[in-house]
Swiss-Prot record:
InterPro entries: 6-PGluconate_DH-like_C_sf, 6PGD_dom2, G3P_DH_NAD-dep, G3P_DH_NAD-dep_C, G3P_DH_NAD-dep_N, NAD(P)-bd_dom_sf. This is Glycerol-3-phosphate dehydrogenase [NAD(P)+]. The lineage of its organism: Bacteria, Pseudomonadati, Pseudomonadota, Gammaproteobacteria, Lysobacterales. Belongs to the NAD-dependent glycerol-3-phosphate dehydrogenase family. NADPH binds at S15, W16, R36, K110, A143, R258, V282, E284. It comes from Xanthomonas euvesicatoria pv. vesicatoria (strain 85-10). The keyword Lipid metabolism applies. Keywords: Cytoplasm, Lipid biosynthesis, Lipid metabolism, NAD, NADP, Nucleotide-binding, Oxidoreductase, Phospholipid biosynthesis, Phospholipid metabolism. One of its GO terms (biological process) is glycerol-3-phosphate catabolic process. Its main location: cytoplasm. The gene is gpsA. Its EC number is 1.1.1.94.
Amino acid sequence: MSDWTHKIAVLGAGSWGTALAALLARHGHPTVLWGRDAAMVDTIDRTHENARYLPGIALPDSLRATTDLQAAVADATWILVVVPSHAFTETIRLIAPLRPAGAGVAWATKGFEPGSGRFLHEVARDILGPSVPLAVVTGPSFAKEVTLGLPTAITVHGDDAAFAQVVADAMHGPTFRAYTGDDMVGAELGGAMKNVLAVATGVADGMQLGLNARAGLITRGLNEMLRLAAVIGARPETLMGLAGLGDLVLTCTGDLSRNRRLGLALGRGQSLDDAIREIGQVVESVQTADEVMRQAEHHGIELPISNAVRAVLHGEITPEAGLKELLARERKPEYPQTLFT
């Protein structure tokens, strides 16, 4: 927890945006939460509860909420964007002319830009220009547990070490550890791919394939992360840390994960539409699976688990057929000799 306070604008009043805004407010930072839904935002501001996404959990009295974006970012020391990946580009464009001079921009969004497959730091840099400090907040963290004050560890990676440290210091506290790094590519890759792989483990558990299968999918899923990391310039140690392995294990095993719950529903025979409707929130893996495989095809590498998830989500194969294909693959060395070189 830092010894000085910042005014922080948190953009996105879903479960994760609300949790991070509450965390920052509890640490003594004047924090404003911005959202589009006027009724929900008004309720948060008046009752200090996000009844839609975090029902029954009291938010700090000091936390303010508004639908006025200009008012939210005015005089902000830095801005934290926490919107779904499909809304990220638009949100960055909206804040570009409103951002106070010198204010850095961080985000806790996980995924790629839909359509282009670009990393989110590439999108932000393209829109905001070369001089704005940027950082990505990622790691194994369920919003509900953070809001309840349960122990959590995350990591902040940025292209400006001083700004990454500012963000980490503001978040760090008695039950919330915030580390720092400078591998934005690796941090964003881990945060995106774990959502796809969580669907795979959810499907396996929904089909009651056992704990051995789950462990195998997590481990081989990590291998796929490392394989893609090796060809796009990410560092393997980033994927072996909180941004990769940590987030992967949590999302693949914790039933608070929307992506795991999607897989569970598909493994039990539900349709994709019914499963998404039942979850009732954005499920990033549906779009991210396409972008992951676009990256893999561009670089000429195989990601069999991710590809099977993509095919199941598109209705091209059944979960049973996907499992059969994975088990029938030719055996190879567990790790290529070039993976860590």
